[in-house]
Amino acid sequence: MTNQLTTNEGQPWADNQHSQTAGQRGPVLIQDYQLLEKLAHFNRERIPERVVHAKGAGAKGYFKVTKDMSAYTKAAVFSGVGKKTPLITRFSQVAGEAGYPDTYRDVRGFAVKFYTEEGNYDIVGNNTPVFFVNDPLKFPDFIHSQKRDPRTHARSQDMQWDFWSLSPESVHQVTILMSDRGIPASYRMMHGFGSHTFKWVNAQGEQFWVKYHFKTNQGIHNLSNELADELAGKDTDYLQNDLFDAIETGDYPSWTVAVQLVPYEDGLNYPQDIFDVTKVISQKDYPLIEIGQMVLDENPTNNFEDIQELAFSPANLVPGIEASPDKLLQGRLFGYKDAERYRLGANYEQLPVNRPKVPVHNYERDGAMAQNQATGVNYEPNSQDGPTEVPAAKIHGDQLSGTTGNFSADPDYYSAAGKLYRLLSADEQTRLIENIRMNLGQVTKPEIQIREVKQFYQADPEYGRRVATSVKLRFSSV
């Protein structure tokens, strides 16, 4: 049955093809309120795009527990073999705008929102286990360097490599980005990582450090530079279409979800800083433990409502899962929610896709587009049967000491990148060097190239020498 056309107020709409005019050839009448409403709404259809991760796609699905983890965390989402929790995901680029080609070389966002019985739990990571910077103070500058030149409004290799060459902590992530995995062939065919270290707490108060890994069950597949360039010209939404079409035809992508668990004290005494997001925890020391499967089996029914209005935050934690001292994570706990307040409004949590599946009871009221919490009391303490605190949900703090100040982090930013380079096959190393040449070779200032080659050399001398040769630098100048 065809629905009746109406205005936004529900009134029947007689003619949506012709404006009201003074005669057949006369001017449009200001009394045509339906025309005015249509134009006014059109002017307000767009919302600010995400300041990062603007281009992306998503899908709905579920997480199924395959190993009960209640010995390590009291979070209900990870307890009980066979338990299913609905979720929604979003995969994205980092730097490109909303219309940017999907096959541009970039880190990919990998975000998951679990609708648990204890509220929403978000894992907001990437398709790489590390990141470019480890201090939130540097994050805005990093993003500025990856976006458009304020004068030319063009992407700038000089800006990107200038920042990287002056930020030694970035060399590990840059190596991953310039490797084969810098251009995934499909969102379905890439791994995901929580990136940061988090804390798990069990019902007895025992604490563990945890890192999340999402291992694609479709296998890792990447694009060559040539094919990526070809697809960018033919289908700018290639990865988005690939994900949608696969799910639409019943080819549901899935990931094996695993964790690295580190006993609390062991983490504090680990040879490297496990709270530095530019580094990984060796799987030889702490092997992966499979905990479940993530399956995506439903496409968005309305992309704007399901994906554009979708909001993630690392601060969306549930009892049994807590933040760690990771500096970049600490900054993200604020930054993401503040970004959504700007992009979607003060009450973005009330949008259907962000609304938890459990009732919400608190003392926050009003604001733009608010659906208030009935007639309940709006202050605390009170004696009016308002919602009460839940002591069992308290966090388990860490013992902290030290002098306040601005501190640099671990100076060893090179060994991990060197190990990664040496783990690559000869063919993978050759493609890595060629990918760097294609990008670093476009830099117009030799001093930037020299600084970056020095970074690669400190990671591995052969690595540095090969990059220097590829961009035609005399190694003596390095």
UniProtKB/Swiss-Prot annotation:
Domain of life: Bacteria
Protein's GO biological process: hydrogen peroxide catabolic process; response to hydrogen peroxide
Binding site for heme: Y336
Residue ranges, annotated region (Disordered): 1-23
PROSITE patterns: CATALASE_1, CATALASE_2, CATALASE_3
Principal cellular location given in the protein's record: cytoplasm
Subcellular location: Cytoplasm
SUPFAM superfamilies noted in UniProt: Heme-dependent catalase-like
GO molecular function: catalase activity; heme binding; metal ion binding
Documented EC number(s): 1.11.1.6
Catalytic activity from the UniProt record: 2 H2O2 = O2 + 2 H2O
Pfam families (UniProt xref): Catalase, Catalase-rel
Keyword line: Cytoplasm, Heme, Hydrogen peroxide, Iron, Metal-binding, Oxidoreductase, Peroxidase
Requisite cofactors: heme
Function (record text): Decomposes hydrogen peroxide into water and oxygen; serves to protect cells from the toxic effects of hydrogen peroxide.
Similarity comment text for this entry: Belongs to the catalase family.
Protein name: Catalase
Top-level taxonomy: Bacteria, Bacillati, Bacillota, Bacilli, Lactobacillales
Gene: katA
